[in-house]
């Protein structure tokens, strides 16, 4: 881009260029314009500050974002963007003490905390081992009459799941399903299934799977209508859960659903399928997946592939094949 001539540029033009550079990620150019505005004894407008802080925060340049934030607070440059300004800061800070400082500043200035901020607070508590305090936030939300949206429910579900409180996690799911304001979304199911698998409650994970996939066509249709498609991560988690139980048909079904969504099975997924067949005692089917991997140009067997095959053929007492796979790994 050609350099900007700064002679006789109006303040509104400065603001327009700052916002443009923020949108395009050219923060150094925006910083130069900010410095020039300051040298002229003026300041950007509220929207320019918000755009600047959002951009810096998204790039994890939190010290610079914090400095601009304090400038905004000091000179009361809020406009109509005060909540958006605070949300940008809260969403990007990784350290709980800094996030809390921003939240407390919001409370001090009588800004109404929204569900986004409360969800962030719950996650701060969760990530620092204070899950009971995280649940106390839910009571605060109820007391002020803020509707419990799906993001708050998801934060609570993820908190219970992380600390193995699976019964409580399911109770929150029931409340969400009964809610007139919110419904479970793909993040809800991802979290429920992932934590149940993580804590060894595979049967319940499979039950949750059937709850969302009773009518796969209807589910996918709903997700797409909301602009959300089932993720590769969800399919992988479900396939692995079935594979651990040796449920081959279900594992294959999940992989086919994934292919129907245009997600190509990768080596991890195919290793999962080998494991499913091996656990079910179908070593020849496991071998056919191995041959498929070998024939695929962009995928190559790894140590997991061979170790899984060795387990499958050990179960089948085909020890000569176990030796042959072992030799390949040397």
UniProtKB/Swiss-Prot annotation:
Query: Which Pfam family would be a valid example here?
Result: PPR
- PROSITE patterns assigned: PPR
Q: Which UniProt keywords apply?
A: Repeat
What InterPro entries does the annotation carry? Pentatricopeptide_rpt, PPR/CCM1_RNA-binding, TPR-like_helical_dom_sf
Entry annotated with the keyword Repeat: yes
Residue ranges of the PPR repeats are: 10-44, 45-75, 83-113, 114-148, 149-179, 185-215, 231-265, 266-296, 302-330
Q: Which NCBIfam families match?
A: PPR (TIGR00756)
Q: Tell me the protein family, please.
A: Belongs to the PPR family. P subfamily.
Query: What name does the UniProt record give this protein?
Result: Putative pentatricopeptide repeat-containing protein At5g36300
Organism from which the protein derives: Arabidopsis thaliana (Mouse-ear cress)
């Amino acid at each position: 881009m050609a350099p900007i001539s700064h002679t006789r540029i109006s303040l509104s033009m400065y603001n327009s260029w700052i916002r443009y550079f923020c949108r395009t990620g050219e923060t150094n150019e925006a910083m130069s314009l900010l410095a020039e505005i300051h040298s002229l004894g003026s300041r950007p407008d509220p929207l320019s500050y918000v755009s600047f802080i959002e951009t810096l925060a998204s790039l994890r340049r939190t010290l610079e974002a914090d400095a601009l934030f304090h400038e905004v607070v000091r000179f009361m440059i809020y406009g109509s963007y005060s909540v958006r300004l605070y949300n940008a800061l809260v969403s990007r800070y990784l350290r709980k003490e800094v996030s809390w400082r921003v939240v407390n500043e919001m409370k001090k200035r009588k800004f109404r905390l929204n569900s986004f901020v409360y969800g962030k607070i719950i996650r701060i508590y969760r990530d620092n081992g204070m899950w009971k305090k995280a649940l106390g936030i839910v009571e605060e939300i109820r007391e002020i009459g803020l509707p419990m949206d799906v993001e708050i429910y998801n934060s609570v579900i993820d908190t219970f799941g992380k600390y193995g409180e699976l019964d409580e996690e399911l109770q929150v799911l029931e409340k969400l399903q009964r809610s007139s304001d919110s419904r479970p979304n793909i993040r809800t199911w991802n979290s429920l299934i992932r934590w149940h698998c993580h804590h060894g409650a595979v049967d319940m994970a499979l039950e949750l799977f059937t709850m969302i996939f009773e009518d796969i066509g209807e589910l996918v249709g709903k997700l797409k209508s909301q602009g959300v498609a089932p993720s590769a991560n969800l399919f992988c988690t479900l396939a692995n859960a079935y594979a651990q139980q040796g449920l081959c048909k279900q594992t294959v079904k999940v992989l086919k659903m994934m292919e129907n969504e245009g997600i190509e099975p990768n080596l991890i997924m195919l290793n999962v399928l080998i494991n499913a067949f091996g656990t079910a005692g179908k070593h020849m089917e496991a071998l056919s997946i191995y041959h498929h991997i070998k024939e695929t140009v962009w995928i190559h067997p790894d140590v997991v592939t061979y170790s899984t095959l060795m387990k499958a053929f050990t179960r089948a007492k085909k020890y000569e094949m176990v030796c042959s796979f072992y030799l390949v790994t040397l």
